[in-house]
């Protein structure tokens, strides 16, 4: 049973592909959701953020995400400090969840890790699945979904790994510009092939 790391840039279809894997009986984990959990109220991650950045980044004992996002968007050293807090906590929690899921003997496990290319392949990932699409399609999808101006989406894209960098770490590439049913068949084929290896 393999653990796949699923990654792709903003607007690449990560949520859709995760759902397609779930439709095939494959449990999935979301690193972003785990990141939210490790900084929830009364969690050690939140206390560490308060120690590092100050209580101005908390509102009623909870993380003020908008304020922290603004800081790290404009300050590379603050972003690095936040990642130094979050990444070990996210990795530890993800490993715990994977071990729990393995006891159920699923066909595979998929962990959505948006920043996998930037942060490196974690030890618990056997193979990396990269979602690929043309940059113009990516931009259109992200603008439509997030209802943000093109300039804001472009800024996010520029902070992420490039398409070439993502493709360089890929063990498997899924083209998310194709019709949903074709993508579903690609996932079924991938699972069938890898179950027999």
UniProtKB/Swiss-Prot annotation:
Keyword terms of this UniProt record: ATP-binding, Coenzyme A biosynthesis, Cytoplasm, Kinase, Nucleotide-binding, Transferase
GO terms classed as biological process: coenzyme A biosynthetic process
Any one GO cellular component localisation term in the record: cytoplasm
Presence of keyword Kinase: yes
Subcellular location field: Cytoplasm
Reaction equation(s) it catalyzes: 3'-dephospho-CoA + ATP = ADP + CoA + H(+)
Pfam families the UniProt entry points to: CoaE
GO molecular function, one term: dephospho-CoA kinase activity
Its EC number(s): 2.7.1.24
SUPFAM superfamilies attached to this UniProt entry: P-loop containing nucleoside triphosphate hydrolases
InterPro entries: Depp_CoAkinase, P-loop_NTPase
Domain DPCK: 3-197
Binding site for ATP: 11-16
PROSITE patterns linked to this entry: DPCK (PS51219)
Pathway terms, separated by semicolons: Cofactor biosynthesis; coenzyme A biosynthesis; CoA from (R)-pantothenate: step 5/5
Function: Catalyzes the phosphorylation of the 3'-hydroxyl group of dephosphocoenzyme A to form coenzyme A.
Family: Belongs to the CoaE family.
Designated name of the protein: Dephospho-CoA kinase
Source organism of the structure: Hydrogenovibrio crunogenus (strain DSM 25203 / XCL-2)
Lineage start: Bacteria, Pseudomonadati, Pseudomonadota, Gammaproteobacteria, Thiotrichales
Gene: coaE
């Amino acid at each position: 049973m393999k653990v796949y790391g699923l990654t792709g840039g903003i607007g690449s279809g990560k949520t859709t592909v995760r759902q397609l894997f779930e439709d095939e009986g494959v449990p999935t984990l979301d690193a972003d959701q785990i990141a939210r959990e490790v900084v929830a109220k009364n969690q050690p991650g939140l206390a560490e953020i308060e120690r590092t950045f100050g209580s101005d980044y908390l509102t009623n004992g909870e993380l003020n995400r908008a304020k922290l996002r603004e800081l790290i968007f404009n300050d590379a050293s603050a972003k690095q400090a936040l990642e130094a807090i979050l990444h070990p906590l996210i990795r530890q929690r993800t490993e715990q969840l994977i071990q729990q899921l393995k006891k159920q003997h699923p066909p595979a496990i998929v962990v959505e890790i948006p920043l996998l290319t930037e942060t490196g392949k974690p030890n618990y990932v056997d193979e990396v699945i990269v979602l690929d699409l043309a940059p113009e399609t990516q931009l259109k999808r992200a603008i439509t979904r997030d209802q943000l101006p093109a300039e804001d989406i472009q800024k996010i894209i520029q902070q992420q790994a490039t398409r070439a960098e993502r493709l360089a770490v890929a063990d498997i590439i899924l083209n998310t510009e194709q019709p949903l049913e074709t993508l579903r068949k690609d996932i079924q084929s991938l699972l069938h092939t890898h179950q027999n290896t």
